[in-house]
Every structure is written in C-alpha cells, then in structure tokens.
C-alpha cells in the first residue's frame, strides 16, 4: 500500500500516526527512537507522559467532562516488532522502515 493510500484511509488522523510510526525501525532491543516518538506524542497532547524503570511508556488521559465517575480504560501495546521476512527479500529491520 502506498503512502498516499494509507494517508487517505479514514479516520485520517489515526492512519497519519500509523504511517509515521511505521517509518521508525524498531526490532526488539532497538526501541529508543519509537519510545521517543510515543513520549513526544503524549506530551504534544499535554497528557501526563512518563517512562518507568523498565522502559514502559505510560500516557494518562483524564476522563472527559461528565464521565469522571466512569470505569477506567487501559490500552496496552508493544512498541517493538519481531521482524520477519522471506529469505529472498532484502530488508534491514534495524534501519529500514516497513
């Protein structure tokens, strides 16, 4: 899928960040750049953003007005990727975006 096709998917804001994230090589053990990307993302939205001792990134968003007594939602994800490719494909996951 081309960049323009990705950026024209809806909702466009989600796919914009998906595309930016996929420009960052991030095999296991090489997560500095993707960690910075996610930390900067949280901070750019003025959200409480921190990294714990083990390297996890935590972003906290307060409840929307009127929903303060609602249940808490947690979204969890890995920042790294386990690279896989066919033997005949030339791709360096430590430096090439996907």
Mark where each language-model region is.
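Intrinsically disordered, low-complexity boundary segments flanking structured domains
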Residues: 8, 45, 86-88
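A non-catalytic alpha/beta surface segment that caps or lines the substrate-entry region
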Residues: 27-74
């Amino acid at each position: 899928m081309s960049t323009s096709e990705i950026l024209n998917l809806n909702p466009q804001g989600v796919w914009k960040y998906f595309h930016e994230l996929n420009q960052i090589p991030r095999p296991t053990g090489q997560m500095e750049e993707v960690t910075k990307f996610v930390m900067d993302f949280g901070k750019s939205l003025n959200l409480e953003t921190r990294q714990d001792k083990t390297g996890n990134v935590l972003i906290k968003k307060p409840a929307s007005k009127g929903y303060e007594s609602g249940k808490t939602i947690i979204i969890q994800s890995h920042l790294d990727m386990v690279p896989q490719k066919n033997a005949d494909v030339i791709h360096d996951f430590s430096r090439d975006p996907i």
